[in-house]
Amino acid sequence: MAFLDEYAAVMNRHTGLKVYNGFRRGHTGLSIDAGFGSGMLLWLEDGQYCFDEEERGKVRKGGCFSSPSVELTQKVMVNYTVSILRHRLGLPVLGVPTKADELPSGWVLQETPTWRFVALDGPQGEHLEFAASGARYCVALAWLYDVSPSELLNAYMLPDGGPLLRQWLGYPYLR
């Protein structure tokens, strides 16, 4: 959970958001207050790490993305909130792929009949388990499979995204 302290420090310092890491104090969530009653949450619910936007002070059960892996959920949170950070730093638009047809070669997105995405399987036997309400939350996870949330956050803070993200300079953000 050390990454959440790093994330909170970066976002608090550079964005004007108020990020509170409750996990650090034994609570089960991280809150991102965007002001005017809006924000985002990363929380632990029934063994799943969930992420979603807060709407009128509430979030949907399970969030827009959930996984037993806190690292996967942290990457989704970073990809979702990075537009705020890059804008405040005066950096150009840089977003990772978000559409199912933009998966890297050999990766397959598993979908349920209820239009919920539940896993990504990679060409080398990789299996990422989650529940997502849209492909836009999980496609980037295939591209960023072997990248830590900290490496991802730091790459987003480079003007051109560095070697990790440079290829997507100018792509639209996840929103």
Predicted regions span which residues?
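Leu/Val/Ala/Ile-rich N-terminal alpha-helices, chiefly Sec-type signal peptides and the beginnings
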Residues: M1-F23, H27
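Short small/polar-residue motifs
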Residues: R13-Y20, G35-M40, A100-T112
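Amphipathic, interaction-prone secondary-structure segments
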Residues: G22-E45, T112-G122
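Short aromatic-glycine-(Arg/Gly/Cys) micro-motifs in beta-strand/loop hairpins
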Residues: A34-G62, R175
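Short amphipathic beta-strand/extended segments with alternating polar/hydrophobic composition
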Residues: M40-L44, K61-S69, D121-R136
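Acidic, aromatic-enriched beta-alpha/helix-loop junctions
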Residues: G57-E71, A142-W143, V147
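Surface-exposed beta-loop interaction hotspot
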Residues: S67-P123
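Intrinsically disordered, low-complexity, charge-dense segments enriched in Lys/Arg
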Residues: T98-R175
